[in-house]
Amino acid sequence: MKKQNMIKNSGYKAEGFIGQYQKLVREVVIPYQYSVLNDELPDVEKSHVIDNFRNAAAAVRGEDTKDGFYGMVFQDSDAGKWIEAAAYSLQNCPDKELEKTVDEFIDIIADAQEENGYLNTYFTIKDKEKRWTNLLEAHELYTAGHLIEGACAYYEATGKRKFLDVMIKNVKHIYNHFVTENHEGFPGHPEIELALLKLYRITGDRDCLELCKKFIDTRGVNTDFYKQEKAKRDWTVWGNNAEDNYYQQSNAPVRELEKATGHAVRAVYLYTAMADLSGETDDEELFAACERLWQDITERKTYITGAIGSTVHGEAFSTDYDLPSDTAYAETCASIGLMFFAARMLEKEVDGRYSDMMERAFYNTVLAGMQLDGKRFFYVNPLEVVPGISGVIATHWHARPQRPGWYGCACCPPNVARLISSFGQYAYGENEDTAFCHLFAGGKVEFSNGMKLTCETRYPYGFAVTYKIEKGGKLAVRIPSWSESYLVLLNKKPVRTEKIKGYVYIEVADGDTLIITLDDSIKTNYPNTVIHDLSGKVALSRGPLVYCFEGVDNDNDVLSIALKSGGKAIVTEISDLPCDSIAIGVEAVRKTSPAGLYSFTPPLIEQIAAVGVPYYIWGNRGENQMRVWMDEI
């Protein structure tokens, strides 16, 4: 059974660092993204998402719209994620104009639904006869999942049922196809599984639970399914290898999986649903599989920034310890999915391993996925960039040195928006008698067990976290694994505490003040020697933030810099940081080589002070070199 549940988004009102990000999403990101979805911006990649729904609605009315679809086969999913982000934002801060915009969008979506409940603009517009014939590539179930999530969030935010009822009808259609009529199959891109569990908890309809369970339980049982499916059709979307079961996470029944393989986002979305289902049904065998997969990812396949999926080939996991910096794929959505997975594991087992990884992924890769102005986005998050190579040559084309305004495949931008807007669901949890503080997020929190508190902190730049207790009880606060020392004060008096799997448990009463002070030192991180790409390199971090070195702060050349072993590192300020951030200065040397490609003459050594900035803000001051892992001398 679950040890705790994440709070509902409505229970958290953000302030401080998270509050500023939620304000940015509310005031800039959500309106900007709607303008993109509605094709209103001339200088960014066209989305056509809303027009696809309009054209599908016309097709439902009997009009000829075969040329009316534009974009990826899963383009509808952007609508679900954007509505979900808007819904969370409405919970955080009511906005009648935004609500009106969402309602109008929902009207268009509802008009695109067919009488039998089917809802997918690609097939409604292009070819109704081919629906449900290409689960591997066509992603009908994936797009349905994101629309379900959007509908659930909007219902919880507003109480309005229209979108929820549309998706309930759609799920009944899907249930009829896969359960009642017993058609074989499971999603090529997992997502609907986790969405069905959300819908089940809202509606109580056990058909949702049964359908989720069928998709998970049948996955990988018939390892020839995608091959057999391909043999029955004469068309393809991507030309995927239907026999690559490791890429599709269908190489074995899910309870037998040992290694995280294949497309990274698909994998962690699947594992999220598996972990959630294990908690919902007390399936310990399923949870044991999740634990094996978690260990494989975090102990062998995760970047220091909380990024996963190291290879561009298939946006996938590579082999163990293959974590290149300059060709890293490290998709933003994959780190978001890793946070989803961590949150569900944390519900089943309160362990700081999971919340530590949520924090690492969020404050580094997820935040790096969006420009500080909220209008440009990274799909790929390399740990080293060299202009003229990155984003240019064939081996590095994916690792762009600057964030684009949008993408033809725009899964990441609305994903970032919905995660930031729902941050409370990851920061805080609860059970009958305990309030859990998993991440340090300033603001007011109300728990369903009656506890109430206000968190005050400058985190991630300040390391004192104050909890002012309005309604008391038992409080569980995570002590991050990176904090080698910490101090706990209750009403200004030190409290002796024992860490239990990374958490301290303290009884607090109405009116109490609890202060947790964490380690604020700058730390040198050394990679395991089995990571071939990182031999002789180090990375710096402070708190949850990994630091990088950009050319703009270092005479436009970070490749020639080596950090001094044992060198002094200090907190510093630089005038042109694009946000309220803190830099670090560290003793280093610059190597200057003689002319020629190779030489018998060693480089000249100059003593310098190198400047590092938080990884999440890189690329906000123009195109220049960037490196996380630095040579050490």
Give residue spans per PLM region.
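A conserved hydrophobic secondary-structure block that centers on an alpha-helix together
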Residues: 126-202
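Well-ordered alpha-helical scaffold segments within catalytic/enzyme domains
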Residues: 18, 83-96, 145-160, 193-205, ...
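Low-complexity, Ser/Thr/Pro/Gly-enriched N-terminal "stalk/linker" regions
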Residues: 1-78, 103-123, 161
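C-terminal beta-rich recognition modules with glycine/proline-rich loops and embedded aromatic residues
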Residues: 10, 212, 290, 356-364, ...
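Carbohydrate-binding/catalytic loop surfaces
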Residues: 45-72, 120-139, 190-202, 229-263, ...
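Hydrophobic core segments within long, regular secondary-structure runs in both alpha-
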Residues: 15, 22, 26, 34, ...
